[in-house]
Amino acid sequence: MTRLNVLLHEMVPDHQIMTDEDVKNLLTTFDITEDHLPKIYHDDPAVKACGAKPGNVIMIVRKSQTAGEATSYRLVVRRPKK
């Protein structure tokens, strides 16, 4: 069975796992903690495709009509059980 890699779809922005050093620089630059970052669930298809685990920080780079490119950061967390 062939699996679809969602990261190859033209509508899905680039997702990359950040190194610990890059995360430290990000948090220092913006004077925040990881708790201040927006969250993304560990079972999100793009998170699964890039191999991220809970606790990783993902850098997402989107094309933007106004800015050319927009970068956002998300902390990978486990989805709460219902």
Curated annotation (Swiss-Prot):
One of its GO terms (molecular function) is DNA-directed RNA polymerase activity. The keyword Transferase applies. Its main location: cytoplasm. InterPro entries: Arch_Rpo5/euc_Rpb5, RNA_pol_subH/Rpb5_C, RPB5-like_sf. GO terms for biological process: transcription by RNA polymerase II; transcription elongation by RNA polymerase I; tRNA transcription by RNA polymerase III. Keywords: Cytoplasm, DNA-directed RNA polymerase, Nucleotidyltransferase, Transcription, Transferase. It is found in: Cytoplasm. One of its GO terms (cellular component) is cytoplasm. It catalyses: RNA(n) + a ribonucleoside 5'-triphosphate = RNA(n+1) + diphosphate. It comes from the Archaea. Its EC number is 2.7.7.6. The keyword Cytoplasm applies. Gene3D superfamilies: RPB5-like RNA polymerase subunit. NCBIfam families: PRK09570.1. DNA-dependent RNA polymerase (RNAP) catalyzes the transcription of DNA into RNA using the four ribonucleoside triphosphates as substrates. Part of the RNA polymerase complex. Belongs to the archaeal Rpo5/eukaryotic RPB5 RNA polymerase subunit family. This is DNA-directed RNA polymerase subunit Rpo5.
